[in-house]
Amino acid sequence: MSSLHKFKAYFGMVPLDDYEDEYLDEPEPARRPARPARDSGRDPYLDRDDRDFAEPAFSKAAYAPGRRDDLDDDFDRYDGPRHSSRVEPVAVRSARPSASGAVRGSTRGALAVDTRSERVESRRGPLFDEGGPLSKITTLRPRDYGEARTIGERFRDGTPVIMDLVEMSNADAKRLVDFAAGLAFALRGSFDKVATKVFLLSPADIDVSAEERRRIAETGFYSQK
């Protein structure tokens, strides 16, 4: 059919029967080429297109809970390395006796000696000895401003007073510091800071130097009274 005749048939200028469209003709189903003989070397059981191939049947017994637990046990079970239960003896070194026959090491029990307190005592020196300037010193730890009267009475009697205000709130501690400063000024004494929230009130006849205040702070004397 010529191109002109196809054009006329497309626009209805000629009968439709005379129009033969090769695109409307249904092609014949392609025939599957014959499978060659099993001489290609392929495994016929691996060819899924083969009619002889069949999927293996699903077996519920293989996935039963008991069977699954058996399979898990095969992989979960692990035998760790075995260690010998025999206990090896450990050599114990005995302490060497010193030249005086005493065993080296710290002494425990009733015979123990607190060397730290001895060092503290040695650092105090004559400052706190009997007859020293601070031999009558007293430490007061007020909990509120109501104890200011006790501090004033001790200081009025000529006793040096250490005020430990650590346990007081900041507001009450500030009020007590103002009271002590005014008290020291009125009685011609001195009012000095020893440590954080710790102060020393000294009467007029007792002069405490800066070095002595430093020694009070180092020895922690105010915390032992």
Curated annotation (Swiss-Prot):
Keywords: Cell cycle, Cell division, Cytoplasm, Septation. It is found in: Cytoplasm. Cell division protein that is part of the divisome complex and is recruited early to the Z-ring. Probably stimulates Z-ring formation, perhaps through the cross-linking of FtsZ protofilaments. Its function overlaps with FtsA. Its main location: cytoplasm. Belongs to the SepF family. The keyword Lipoprotein does not apply. The gene is sepF. This is Cell division protein SepF. Residues 28-54, 77-86 have a biased composition (Basic and acidic residues). Homodimer. Interacts with FtsZ. The keyword Cell cycle applies. InterPro entries: Cell_div_SepF (IPR023052), Cell_div_SepF/SepF-rel (IPR007561), SepF-like_sf (IPR038594). Residues 22-116 are annotated as: Disordered. One of its GO terms (biological process) is FtsZ-dependent cytokinesis. The lineage of its organism: Bacteria, Bacillati, Actinomycetota, Actinomycetes, Mycobacteriales. GO terms for cellular component: cytoplasm. It comes from Rhodococcus jostii (strain RHA1).
